[in-house]
């Protein structure tokens, strides 16, 4: 018969210690590999994030450069600003009518009438649909303030509901809404309701932000009613201003 070999206590302990060391070392090595992979993944994510950031910054920088070049070309007369509105229409009142009256826009591209308010937008929806422009501008306000339309449940809500009728038939168009251009101080003195420009514009801007529409701030080009751009009535504009206004609109769109 073969005799069973009995390990001495010291040999057993040594074997157990050896196995324990192997387990610990294996665990350590596994942890190191996992930790290395995790660190590597984090590093790669960081590198990718920085690369994406650089691409965005470069894209933004190139866009800014192109816009600066375009602005310079427009100001120098190398580019006709009104040619950039070939596929655009503008809804509005008598102020907007100036674009066709002074022959800057074709009459069919100016969906406006004297004394119009935002409530008249619906009158032009069918024409907008038939033209299907890529850019749709809106410019109202003087008559709206005169009639106190903000008292009818909120000017911004009313304006939005009107624009949505246009969006429904021209879903691919970019929507651009002008701030109300202030009348002169003398004109406001005669008609105090026109003094609510800031109040109305705040609502127009909030409406645009809510709906992802483009808001055009015209306060600088009219100098809050003090610029030399007005006809004798202090409300309507002289012919040269329409070029300035068009530049402000199109450059605002390009900078988005």
Task: Tell where the protein language model's regions lie, with residue ranges.
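N-terminal secretory targeting modules
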Residues: 1-85
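Catalytic His-Asp segment of secreted/periplasmic serine-dependent ester chemistry enzymes
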Residues: 37, 183-256
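Conserved SGNH/GDSL esterase-like catalytic core that processes O-acyl groups on lipids
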Residues: 75-158
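Second-shell loop/turn segments in exported
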Residues: 111-115, 144-153, 166, 189-194, ...
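Alpha/beta-hydrolase-fold catalytic nucleophile elbow
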Residues: 139, 178-179
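Charged helix-capping and loop-helix junction motifs
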Residues: 152-162, 194-200
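A short helix->loop->beta-strand "cap" motif at the edges of active sites that frequently abuts
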Residues: 170-174
């Amino acid at each position: 018969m073969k005799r069973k070999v009995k390990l001495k206590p010291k040999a057993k302990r040594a074997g157990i210690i050896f196995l324990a060391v192997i387990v610990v070392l294996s665990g350590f090595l596994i942890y190191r590999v996992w930790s290395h992979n995790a660190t590597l993944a984090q590093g790669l994510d960081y590198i990718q994030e920085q690369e994406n950031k650089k691409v965005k910054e470069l894209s933004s920088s190139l866009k800014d450069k192109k816009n600066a070049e375009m602005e310079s070309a427009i100001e120098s007369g190398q580019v006709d600003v009104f040619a950039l509105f070939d596929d655009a229409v503008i809804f509005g009142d008598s102020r907007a009518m100036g674009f066709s009256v002074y022959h800057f826009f074709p009459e069919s591209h100016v969906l406006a009438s004297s004394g119009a308010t935002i409530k008249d937008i619906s009158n032009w929806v069918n024409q907008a649909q038939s033209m299907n422009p890529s850019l749709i501008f809106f410019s109202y306000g003087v008559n709206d303030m005169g009639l106190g339309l903000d008292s009818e449940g909120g000017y911004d809500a009313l304006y939005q509901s009107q624009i949505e009728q246009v969006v429904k038939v021209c879903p691919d168009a970019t929507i651009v809404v002008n701030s109300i251009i202030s009348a002169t101080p003398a004109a406001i003195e005669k008609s105090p309701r026109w003094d609510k420009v800031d109040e109305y514009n705040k609502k127009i801007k909030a409406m645009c932000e809510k709906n992802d529409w483009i808001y055009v701030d015209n306060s600088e080009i009219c100098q809050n009613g003090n610029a030399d751009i007005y006809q004798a009535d202090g409300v309507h504009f002289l012919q040269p201003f329409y070029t300035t206004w068009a530049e402000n609109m199109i450059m605002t769109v390009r900078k988005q």
